[in-house]
Amino acid sequence: MSWQAYVDEHLMCEIEGHHLASAAILGHDGTVWAQSADFPQFKPEEITGIMKDFDEPGHLAPTGMFVATAKYMVIQGEPGAVIRGKKGAGGITIKKTGQALVVGIYDEPMTPGQCNMVVERLGDYLMKQGL
């Protein structure tokens, strides 16, 4: 299966009548492996900050997490594995695997729990595949 198929079929899938606003699979260096049409472009320093938060959980909490200049308040995630952010009625979930970052961005009416489930399920699957 291509990386684009993972994004199209597993991240942008419909959940209870809703779907993510955008999603992507990125390398740890920020290289885009596959993305949905409306996925924002991360700046290099944003990827650096995200990777540092995986290595040093809590790094982003004081300043927030920036994604394509949009600021997300970092909320409880899983240290070293998942970063979650909130911005208004929407948010973001980033799951780190051995080689990739699985990213989902949502807006209402999708819920944070639905976004977490979609992103983390694919991330867990990729980790089981050694990715």
Swiss-Prot record:
GO molecular function per UniProt: actin monomer binding
Motif (Involved in PIP2 interaction): 81-97
PROSITE patterns for this protein: PROFILIN (PS00414)
Function summary: Binds to actin and affects the structure of the cytoskeleton. At high concentrations, profilin prevents the polymerization of actin, whereas it enhances it at low concentrations.
Self-association state and partner proteins as the record states: Occurs in many kinds of cells as a complex with monomeric actin in a 1:1 ratio.
Coiled coil ranges: none
UniProt xrefs under InterPro entries: PFN (IPR048278), PFN_euk (IPR005455), PFN_sf (IPR036140), Profilin_CS (IPR027310)
Residues with Phosphothreonine modification: T111
Family: Belongs to the profilin family.
Alphabetical UniProt keywords: Actin-binding, Allergen, Cytoplasm, Cytoskeleton, Disulfide bond, Phosphoprotein
Keyword Electron transport: no
Organism: Olea europaea (Common olive)
Subcellular location(s) per record: Cytoplasm, Cytoskeleton
Disulfide bonds listed in the record: C13-C115
PTM info: Phosphorylated by MAP kinases.
Presence of the UniProt keyword Phosphoprotein in the record: yes
The protein's name in its UniProt record: Profilin-7
A Pfam match: Profilin
Main location: cytoplasm
Additional remarks: The variability of the residues taking part of IgE-binding epitopes might be responsible of the difference in cross-reactivity among olive pollen cultivars, and between distantly related pollen species, leading to a variable range of allergy reactions among atopic patients.
Gene Ontology terms: cellular component: cell cortex; cytoskeleton
